[in-house]
Regions:
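A generic local structural motif
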Residues: 15, 22-23, 112-115
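Positively charged n-region of N-terminal signal peptides that target proteins for export
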Residues: 1-9
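Active-site-proximal helix/loop segments of hydrolytic enzymes
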Residues: 30, 71-162
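Sec-dependent signal peptide cleavage junction
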Residues: 17-31
């Protein structure tokens, strides 16, 4: 009888530990942030126009050709994908769930289609990689755009400035 009680208690304890472990795993998965990365541009531009946003009457090209390196002559779409893949690897290593809008250069995706990917996966952050060009060699640095003033990833200083 003691042996049966001991086995039952062991089974209850084991099931409790399994349930606790499963709950912790579910909780960890629930907290995992989703980051969507869009490597800007692609092999071929799409010059047909589309609205710049939902309900907008203002239109622009679906995807432009992008810049090229002034020394390397590397097209922006190639550089953007290289950078995006490195960022993907780093974010995955840090525990984020990463969705890539594109993983190759020869795609046909408009800017609206790219945004729909971020919406589909309910992205916590949508990162669009670009390597902008300028007409002057004195222009240097990075450009970061956080389009909404209520964007929780913006710093207080950026909110004040926008």
């Amino acid at each position: 009888m003691k042996r049966i009680i001991s086995m039952c208690l062991s089974a209850v304890l084991l099931l409790s530990l399994c349930a606790t472990g499963a709950a912790k795993i579910a909780q960890a998965e629930e907290k995992q942030k989703v980051i969507v990365i869009d490597a800007g541009h692609q092999t071929r531009a799409m010059s047909a126009t589309e609205p710049i946003g939902p309900g907008s009457s203002q239109r622009k090209a679906k995807v432009t050709g992008g810049a090229s390196g002034c020394v390397t002559h590397l097209p922006e779409y190639k550089l953007n994908l290289q950078v995006a893949k490195k960022l993907q690897k780093e974010l995955v290593n840090r525990g984020y769930k990463v969705i890539m809008v594109r993983t190759k250069n020869n795609v046909r995706m408009s800017n609206v289609q790219r945004a729909k990917v971020a919406n589909k996966y309910k992205a916590d952050a949508f990162i669009r990689i670009h390597a902008n060009s300028a007409g002057s060699s004195s222009v240097k640095g990075a450009l970061t755009i956080a389009p909404a003033s209520n964007n929780r990833y913006m710093t207080k200083a950026n909110r004040k400035a926008s």
